């Protein structure tokens, strides 16, 4: 059975190393900045476990009207075994909120597979222009916004944009 286990101080570095392995530098925070996020009440950094065995990690933020998944990564050696799908199903039932996430435009085969994975879970690709703020004072990253269970209307997108800028990405400026 899939569980989301909050990462403790003792396990933080080892789980964070898996985040480094799964995401390019420009799509994640430095370790010190990631630790600052724990000061925000909306922040969740969890290990995904199955029968107490670690199968991946997820970083998400819970807001009043939506849940934002910032990162999810299943351990390389056990991908395509349904852990990602089951993790999203758990989020859907545990939080009963619309879920929003960012993904790269589908240009490579891997990116196309990733978008298809999310679409198979019921996520919709929104058409809003969106650029993820830089984690390292470099160039921002153009990404697509996906949402579950439906497309975001303009008001919902504006709320997502504003709240993630104020809370999620403000952490980058060390203002926790």
Language-model-detected regions and their locations in the chain:
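Short amphipathic alpha-helix that is part of the acyltransferase structural core
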Residues: 1-29, 143-145, 155-176
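Short beta-strand micro-motifs in enzyme catalytic cores
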Residues: 44-46, 67-70, 140-146
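Conserved GNAT acetyl-CoA-binding A-motif
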Residues: 95-109
